[in-house]
Amino acid sequence: VLSDPAVLIVGQNIKYDIKILSKYGLAFEAIDDTMLMSYALHGGIHRHSMDTLSEKYLGHTPVSIKSLIGTGKSAITFDFVPIDEASNYAAEDADITIRLWKLFKPKLHLSKVTKVYETLERPLVRVLSDMELLGIKVDRDTLVRMSNSFSQKMAHLEEEIYSLAGEKFNVGSPKQLGEILFDKLGYAGGAKGKTGAYSTGADVLADLATEYDLPSKVIDWRQLSKLKSTYTDALQDHINPASGRVHTSYVIAGANTGRLASADPNLQNIPC
């Protein structure tokens, strides 16, 4: 039935379902996606999640997945949810999806965006699901070398910062840095926020760096720390052990401009 081109399969964010079922050798032929229908109709007006669409257009608040599996470290996987609760959740999911489809399908024609949906948005589903399953090849050894290089440069900067400060402290602590800059060294321009700690944001350090070496070196240290923690270290954690690749998720119904977004991890903001 799923692979019968005469049978239309309707989903909400159906790219996710395509990826899951592909692991079991199942494929959809004819598809519609209520999330992308909403995006074609109302892009930039509101979010296009099932909860948002259900509440806005059906006046119904769906059962939250968090209420079933929990959150954080105490969260369970869906296979541990009692079968009656899981069944009700799945049935509601399917019911909301088909009701949204019946609402959006004629609106596409009335709003004259059927062509946008059928020729731009919907065809992307299969392309992006294939891309996500294939993944992005990443050289772990290169990331490790870069992380080690960043660590060495940070350590060297820390020694220079300690020398200028006259003592060791946690360079990554805004509170300790503020005390060094404004209390111990007496730099001008110190301003405390609501927490009582000095502000040591990028703009503050940039102003101080025009006169002093220590703030300039802290700026360099922060840049290296950001590169290491956010990119070279974090990307290693996202490498799938089975494929050796990073499998991001491409978001179609995200940016108001129509451009793709990337999440978990975001591969579109990695510096060259």
Task: Please report, for each region that a protein language model flagged, where it lies by residue.
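Conserved beta-strand -> loop -> alpha-helix junction used to position metal-binding or nucleic-acid-contacting
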Residues: 27-43, 50-52
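Conserved "right-hand" nucleotidyltransferase catalytic core of DNA-directed polymerases
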Residues: 14, 29, 45, 53, ...
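Phosphate- and divalent-cation-binding pockets in alpha/beta enzyme and binding domains
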Residues: 16-23, 180
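Alpha-helical scaffold elements adjacent to nucleotide-binding pockets in ATP/GTP-utilizing enzyme cores
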Residues: 17-20, 49-53
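Catalytic-core regions built around general acid/base machinery
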Residues: 1-4
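Acidic beta-strand-to-loop metal/phosphate-binding motif
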Residues: 6-14
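Hydrophobic side chains within alpha-helical segments
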Residues: 20, 36, 96-98
